[in-house]
């Protein structure tokens, strides 16, 4: 769609709140946003300068739609639904839910107490989230001892062990009034909302009474229940003393990114936090609102009794998203400190993100730039490294790995079976591989490397340079990586005549060379082992009547390794798809081979 068409639509935008939907060339909705004034917000995308991520979004926009709403709150609610419906790729994408465990009282005629990670709208009562299953199980274990709800998922025909332990009312056999269940459910709710202290006091009285009546076994049971309550419910440091469930939000922004931290406070305890980081395209407070809206659309994020927000957030809009929750913007005291703490953690997380990015760039792009400077060549953004592998000249192979801006590009890795060289001739092997690789690069117009690294010394380097210059007419820098007596990277050889490039052993550019040399060596060795395994497998099967190339291939595919074939019975060999008489011949041949190998070892 033409730029003129966009400009005409921009001129018609209203001064009202609403949502806008950006579309790409295929008509796919790639971004949904909301605005207090549509005209100002949408026009801002097509005027002025933007950071790189916003520019990427704008470059893909070829059309847009908008929906006018009566208020900013209504726009927020609509935006949440539109994002949920279209899942635009440029919008905030919350990480996959880390599903926390909840304790649930099921909505059944005979309710159960269970632990679940799935929160559904099924009229069950949910308590949590808990930081892990262990914590949830600890609490459930106490509740099971105090409140004898049924344990079986389906009712049996007779009472079970839990009835004899006093932990089930046995509704499978006895009638249990609904009022009894309601009484227990109310007590569980009170217990989990901080009323466990009352329960503990009641148990202490019962323990004393039982002891006075010489009922020591019963007193011991009460004592164990009291200990369980103390160790499970009181071992965490209290953050608030009113047992109210709260979510505390804080966010920080930097370099076009936002980090939101949510503290989950349950029963007065800070039990867990959620951290989300994402690029934002609107005003920070607007995108933060969008985040909250999406956050509580997730099945495992149940709105608590209270939500604490920073000062600059439209609390009225949040209230519309979670109408049954009290929205608070704390101004002072402990509550304000919690919001500040969430902000501080968000800021630290963002700083850490960018520091890690800088460190990663230092060891990749930065290392490549300094390597080029040390060698006196343009920055070698694309490096192709070669290594040969053989054992006494058998099954010779070579391998090439590619690094782009200091990072391995595995799609550009290549393996080579050596075709023209017999015996252990490393120089001839290098000539063949360089010839095959760069003849194809020339023929197919593939990207040329800025630097070729050879795992070897002067002979290998000269062989590679001779092919490049005199056969292919290419002028590509070639350097060699020499190793010490412990097979570790020790020197970079480059120039004409060859000289050692002075590099600090603890520099990032030296570490980069080590990674390249280790990677190409690993790749070559792995390929050589695979080839040896395959050829070794086939050679053992040579000369067996009825086993030609096709059946060798079938046996290799079925068993995967010689070791497994050696251990196979005749019946198992037959299962590979060969006739019984052939399976018997294979088994006989391999048994004889194993015996011969065993006798050789003993001698």
Swiss-Prot record:
Indicate where this protein is primarily found.
cytoplasm
GO CC, sorted alphabetically, is:
cytoplasm; excinuclease repair complex
Which residues belong to any copy of the GIY-YIG domain?
A: 15-92
- Source species, domain of life: Bacteria
Q: Which residues form the signal peptide?
A: none
Its annotated compartments are: Cytoplasm
What keywords is this UniProt entry annotated with?
Cytoplasm, DNA damage, DNA excision, DNA repair, Excision nuclease, SOS response
For this protein, what is any one GO molecular function term?
A: DNA binding
| Gene3D superfamilies reported for this sequence | 5' to 3' exonuclease, C-terminal subdomain (1.10.150.20), GIY-YIG endonuclease (3.40.1440.10), UVR domain (4.10.860.10), UvrC, RNAse H endonuclease domain (3.30.420.340)
**Record GO biological process:** DNA damage response; nucleotide-excision repair; SOS response
CDD domains for this protein: GIY-YIG_UvrC_Cho
The UVR domain sits at 197-232
Function description: The UvrABC repair system catalyzes the recognition and processing of DNA lesions. UvrC both incises the 5' and 3' sides of the lesion. The N-terminal half is responsible for the 3' incision and the C-terminal half is responsible for the 5' incision.
The text of the family note is: Belongs to the UvrC family.
- Subunit: Interacts with UvrB in an incision complex.
Name of the protein described by the UniProt record: UvrABC system protein C
Classification of source organism:
Bacteria, Bacillati, Bacillota, Bacilli, Bacillales
């Amino acid at each position: 769609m033409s730029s003129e068409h966009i400009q005409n639509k921009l001129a018609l935008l209203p001064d009202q709140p609403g949502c806008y939907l950006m579309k790409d060339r295929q008509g796919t909705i790639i971004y949904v946003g909301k605005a207090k004034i549509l005209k100002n917000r949408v026009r801002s995308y097509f005027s002025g300068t933007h950071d790189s991520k916003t520019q990427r979004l704008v470059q893909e926009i070829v059309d847009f739609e908008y929906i006018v709403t009566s208020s900013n709150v209504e726009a927020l609610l609509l935006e949440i639904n539109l994002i949920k419906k279209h899942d635009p790729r440029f919008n905030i994408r919350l990480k996959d839910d880390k599903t926390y465990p909840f304790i649930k009282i099921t909505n059944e005629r005979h309710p159960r107490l269970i632990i679940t990670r799935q929160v559904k709208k099924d009229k069950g009562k949910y308590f949590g989230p808990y930081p892990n299953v262990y914590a949830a199980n600890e609490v459930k274990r106490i509740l099971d001892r105090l409140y004898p709800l049924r344990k079986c998922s389906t009712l049996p025909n007779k009472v079970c062990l839990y009835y004899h332990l006093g932990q089930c009312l046995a509704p499978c056999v006895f009638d249990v009034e609904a009022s009894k269940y309601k009484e227990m459910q109310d007590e569980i709710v009170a217990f989990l909302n901080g009323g466990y202290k009352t329960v503990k006091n009641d148990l202490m009285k019962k323990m004393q009474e039982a002891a006075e009546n010489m009922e020591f076994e019963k007193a011991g049971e009460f004592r164990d229940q009291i200990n369980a309550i103390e160790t499970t419910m009181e071992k965490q440091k209290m953050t608030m003393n009113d047992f109210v469930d709260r979510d505390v939000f804080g966010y920080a922004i930097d370099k076009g990114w936002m980090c939101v931290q949510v503290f989950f406070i349950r029963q007065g305890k800070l039990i867990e936090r959620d951290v989300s980081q994402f690029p934002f395209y609107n005003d920070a407070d607007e995108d933060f609102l969008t985040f909250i809206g999406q956050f509580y659309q997730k099945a495992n994020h149940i709105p608590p009794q209270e939500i604490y927000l920073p000062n600059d957030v439209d609390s009225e809009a949040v209230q519309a998203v979670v109408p049954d929750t009290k929205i608070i913007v704390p101004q002072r005291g402990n509550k304000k400190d919690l919001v500040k703490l969430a902000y501080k953690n968000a800021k630290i997380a963002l700083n850490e993100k960018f520091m890690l990015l800088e460190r990663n760039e230092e060891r990749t792009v930065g290392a490549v730039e300094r390597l080029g400077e040390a060698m006196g060549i343009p920055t070698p953004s694309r490096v192709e490294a070669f290594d040969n592998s053989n054992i006494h000249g058998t099954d010779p192979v070579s391998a090439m790995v590619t690094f782009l801006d200091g990072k391995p590009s595995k799609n550009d890795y290549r393996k080579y079976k050596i075709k023209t060289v017999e015996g252990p001739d490393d120089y001839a092997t290098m000539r063949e591989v360089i010839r095959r690789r760069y003849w194809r690069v020339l023929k197919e117009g593939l990207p040329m490397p800025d630097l070729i690294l050879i795992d070897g010394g002067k002979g290998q380097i000269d062989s590679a340079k001779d092919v490049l210059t005199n056969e292919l007419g290419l002028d590509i820098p070639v350097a060699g990586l020499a190793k010490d007596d412990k097979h570790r990277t020790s020197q970079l050889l480059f120039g004409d005549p060859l000289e050692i490039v002075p590099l600090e052993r603890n520099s990032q550019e030296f570490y980069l060379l080590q990674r390249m040399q280790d990677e190409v060596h690993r790749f070559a060795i792995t390929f050589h082992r695979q080839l040896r395994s395959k050829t070794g497998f086939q050679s053992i099967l040579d000369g067996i009547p009825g086993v030609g190339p096709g059946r060798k291939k079938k046996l290799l595919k079925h068993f995967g390794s010689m070791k497994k074939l050696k251990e196979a019975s005749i019946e198992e060999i037959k299962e590979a798809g060969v006739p019984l008489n052939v399976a018997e011949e294979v088994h006989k041949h391999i048994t004889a081979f194993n015996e011969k190998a065993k006798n050789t070892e003993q001698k």
